[in-house]
Amino acid sequence: MDNDGALGFGAILRNDVFLAAALSLFMAQFAKALIVLLTRRKAGIKEIFSTLLWKTGGMPSSHAALVISITTSIAFSSGMASDVFALSFFFALVVIRDAMGVRRAAGMQAKALNTLGLRLSKRIHIPFKPVKEIHGHTFPQVVVGSLMGFFIAMAVNTL
């Protein structure tokens, strides 16, 4: 490690890829928490706090914001012809496809299973424990998250 802290904590705070990614993730989760606060009449502080920290699904997609900001920042720092840009680009495609496809489908199936299980539980008195419903993203949620990530990365890398 040299005197300017190139391997220390200070270096990561000067890293535009890290800054854009962290800011995009935070801003997307903050927007999600704000939407919950404005649309749910009885949203408590616990729900707002949990949304801000780790809730998945909803508007905007923090997954999309994060991976698009990383890819955009890498395009600035390493160039679009670099290996690391190609890696980040395809990583972003996989993450977005998973958030919009696999996770969304799994969440819809879990919701259907829970509905069926609760109905059967009431009808024939079989104990039922609901499965976790994973929340994926819709196309508009992914588009908004992607735009957030892109513009935040542009701002971090050009200002």
Language-model region placement:
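Membrane-embedded catalytic cores of phosphoryl/pyrophosphoryl-handling enzymes
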Residues: 26, 47-159
